């Protein structure tokens, strides 16, 4: 067996054992940290979602040393690897990842675009504001909802009007996240549109609007939050 295959197998074994034994890792003897990071990135391609999630957590723990390999993985031929790399970069929160993640908002696979939007919301770098505003128009509703959520985390008032427009999105989960985002930004321009959203046909959207209003105008609305 080649060294590379042994390395990947060893890391996958490490991840699997970690899932079973209270998420504790079996040490990988004889491999450098860069070898482990490479193996974990390979694990992002696995069909097993638990292995992918565990790999993301391991990469998060690796911290800054994993950033450049993860940025490179955003160009992997495997969409699972690209999506996982985006999420892991968001967890690490290193500003080096911002521009590559912005580029990943144009990926042909919606899961990768959604992962990039999620990550940019975690990093909270204002360079992402305009690209995330554009992502509110993405053809995929999950990407739109993650973009709205990310803009709420960034709390930049440039996003207020575009997020208000998202309150009329055809998908309820997008409308709900748009309302939540407006509550985090706390801009008074959102009060009237959010008040109208209290009549939304979807209960989750109505509740999100009520919570947002309670954050923007607590004296008026806090008693009405369910």
Residue ranges of model-derived segments:
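Structural detector for internal amphipathic alpha-helices that build alpha-solenoid repeat scaffolds
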Residues: 28-34, 50-64, 72, 80-94, ...
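Bacterial N-terminal signal peptides that target proteins for export
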Residues: 3-17
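Buried hydrophobic core positions in alpha-solenoid tandem helical repeats
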Residues: 39-40, 69-71, 100-101, 131-132, ...
């Amino acid at each position: 067996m080649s060294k590379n295959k042994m390395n990947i197998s060893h890391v996958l074994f490490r991840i699997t054992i970690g899932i079973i034994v209270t998420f504790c890792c079996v040490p990988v003897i004889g491999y450098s940290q860069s070898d482990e990071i490479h193996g974990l990135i390979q694990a992002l391609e696995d069909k097993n979602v638990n292995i992918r999630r565990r790999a993301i957590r391991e990469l998060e723990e690796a911290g800054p040393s994993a950033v450049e390999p993860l940025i490179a993985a955003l160009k992997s031929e495997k969409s699972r690897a690209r999506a996982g790399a985006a999420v892991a970069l968001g967890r690490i929160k290193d500003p080096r990842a911002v521009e590559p993640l912005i580029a990943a908002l144009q990926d042909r696979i919606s899961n990768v675009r959604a992962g990039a939007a999620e990550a940019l919301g975690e990093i909270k770098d204002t360079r992402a504001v305009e690209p995330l505003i554009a992502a509110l128009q993405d053809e995929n509703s999950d990407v739109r909802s993650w973009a709205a959520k990310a803009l709420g985390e960034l709390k930049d008032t440039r996003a207020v009007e575009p997020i208000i427009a998202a309150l009329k999105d055809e998908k309820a989960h997008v409308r709900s996240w748009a309302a939540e985002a407006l509550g985090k930004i706390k801009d008074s321009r959102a009060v009237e549109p959010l008040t109208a959203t209290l009549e939304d046909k979807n209960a989750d959207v109505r509740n999100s609007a009520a919570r947002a209003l309670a954050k923007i105008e607590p004296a008026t609305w806090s008693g009405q939050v369910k």
